[in-house]
Amino acid sequence: MTDFFAGIPQIRYEGEGSSNEFAFRHYNPDEVILGKRMEDHLRFAVAWWHSFAWPGGDPFGGQTFDRPWFGDTLDLAKLKADVAFEMFDILGAPFFCFHDADIRPEGATFAESKRNLEEIVDHIGIRMEGSKTKLLWGTANLFSHRRFMSGAATNPDPDVFAWSAATVKGCMDATMKLGGANYVLWGGREGYETLLNTDLTREAENAGRFLQMVVDYKHKIGFQGTILIEPKPQEPSKHQYDYDVATVYGFLKRFGLEKEVKLNIEQGHAILAGHSFEHELALAASLGILGSIDMNRNDYQSGWDTDQFPHNHPEMALAYYEILRAGGFTTGGTNFDAKIRRQSLDPEDLVLAHVGGMDTCARALKAAARLYEDGSLETARAARYAGWETPEAQAMLASSLEKIEARVLAEGINPEPRSGRQERLENLWNRFV
């Protein structure tokens, strides 16, 4: 036991009437919604990097957090893990996520970093034996170190490609050893700053080959989890190749991997791409590649990825409605890829941020489930497209332009526009949130 969270009680569900800030008002893990426990719908995860590795810096200033585990030794990394599992237990968090660089100190060589990762994974495994918290997904940090400044899989230097591939292998091994449900790839440096020095064709081909190697290794070692790509349009790169759901799907189709890889979709990244979160979720579901989500929010005035904790349950309800329509999570879940503000220095701030985020998502899920169970929205959606269920409409899809023209002329088809009834549906939505 450490004393970092001393005095902070275990967070329990007390209901909407509670005035206890260290309690859940909406998140009741055992509440059954649409035949499934709330915990199993939401599958919350704590992000190791923002919660325990981020020092509180920004582009204009450095570290503001003074954590007792900050440093580059394995002993401090183990202390960080001990503190992390204490918070997981306080929250009753069912899952966590990590990058390799979050959990182990960087070595002077690849071999040393590999040994450090293996040792800390063993330590985390021991902590997991005494905890209910499991691993939602692992990933490799292929963007922070200067060696990755020109990318990892898309780097012009073959040695960086090799280092990156070896790193991913080790992280996949670690994820499998810890029983992870997924493995994530995020290409923060897989993009370009200027076209003047960029070979787009080569970089795409190398990225495709890299991903194929990941899929091949998954099958070779018998990893039963899902490989996930996380889209983001820019930041840190000027233009990232995994721009949004549609772009990544095109990439997967290009290399024949659309049946092997799904997506981890982040709210903040969707906003940066000029989309709503629910748009990206609905599109991924329609393409069969919805895997998991990173839950956070952006400051809409800032124009960059602020990674704040979710606070707007009507907005989140739109997202969870699309997840329910898609059948819910299988291996995926709700990872809080969110960080407290750099002025929020106290241990209590870290716990309460997660309490608020979990309550916001639970409230959103309940609203979405009420509307989904009511069925009114789906009835209206089906009615709008009912004409396509007729034999004539189905036959037309198997016809030709010439035959369709002949039918239009013969039957004197002259369609009248029909209302989309958007305002009615928005009013319906508001009744449930």
Swiss-Prot record:
EC category: isomerase
Domain of life where this protein originates: Bacteria
Keywords: Carbohydrate metabolism, Cytoplasm, Isomerase, Magnesium, Metal-binding, Xylose metabolism
Cellular compartment(s): Cytoplasm
Catalyzed chemical reaction(s): alpha-D-xylose = alpha-D-xylulofuranose
Any single Gene Ontology cellular-component annotation: cytoplasm
EC number, as in UniProt: 5.3.1.5
Binding site for Mg(2+) 2: 266, 269, 305, 307
Location (main, coarse): cytoplasm
Comment on bound cofactor: Binds 2 magnesium ions per subunit.
Subunit structure: Homotetramer.
Family according to the record: Belongs to the xylose isomerase family.
Protein's name in the database: Xylose isomerase
Species per Swiss-Prot/TrEMBL record: Cereibacter sphaeroides (strain ATCC 17023 / DSM 158 / JCM 6121 / CCUG 31486 / LMG 2827 / NBRC 12203 / NCIMB 8253 / ATH 2.4.1.) (Rhodobacter sphaeroides)
Gene: xylA
